[in-house]
Amino acid sequence: MRALPDRSSALAAIMRGVGRLVRALMREPTGAIGVVLIVALGALAVCAPLLPLKDPLHLYIEHRLEAPGTAFLFGTDQVGRDILSRTIWGARASLSIGLCAVAIGVVLGTGIGLVAGYKAGSWIDEALMKAMEVLASIPLLIWAIALVGITGTDTLHIGPFAVTNETKLVLLIGVLYAPGLARLTYSLARTEVQAEYVAARHLQGVGGARILLSDVLPNIVSPVLVQATLLLGVTIIVEASLSFIGLGVQPPTPSWGAMLSDSRALIFTGDWWVSIFPGAAVFVSVLAFNLVGDAMRTVLDPRRRQRAAETAGGAV
């Protein structure tokens, strides 16, 4: 008798699927460009402490608003901080917040969507999805203002734990991403649980949790990955926007949004480098994740792939 798959085999199946997806992405021109950009940004963010950069917090007062040159490749800001090092270190904040927030949203949203889809038509389904609708009905900015108004921007000390404003931001964004991901997972899971193989698994005596993790989840993970990739680009904009208005990453931690906020008064003074480099970093990051997300849709949707091939053939 064949052994029933356990969680490790389900995880292995998901990882194999992700591996195949990455290989397929590299065969798509836009996907390959996006992957290369993301890898480059990630490498810079991870290796920032090892790179021969100037201190992003040091004030070179005698070099304030110095244009890009050999001493400061990206120039300096109005208080003499090196923009190159601050841009690279800002990638650590933006990418780490994006990855952590999306990870929280995926875990919460996928879990809720799976349970609600499996229990479709029951009170559990109604309660979970109504809660998601209520959560999604209030814009993120309102939640952010309320959170800062209640807790402030300082670090909270809860017992032995220190909750920074960045941590609060990650939790807030992650929780608010859950409704959209839950609705996506719910629609996919509700269709999947009606498949014959799920009924066969029930007849074998397999529990609902095991069916969801071992059978349903691997079959619906691809659209969730596409949505998560697109959300990474959205999160970078959200983090930059909140930091721009003072609700996100707090000084002295380098942040692209805070750098753009600091350079507002210099946009029309000729000191273009102060705002152009953090702005370009936001643009390139969002572009990279959108390219990968769009390529993933093409790879995973046969109809889109066929239309892309027909378009390419017509162009030739």
Region annotations inferred by a language model:
Residues L73, Y118, A127-E192, P223:
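Generic hydrophobic transmembrane alpha-helix motif, especially the helices
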Residues I83-V115, S285:
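Transmembrane alpha-helix signature in integral membrane proteins
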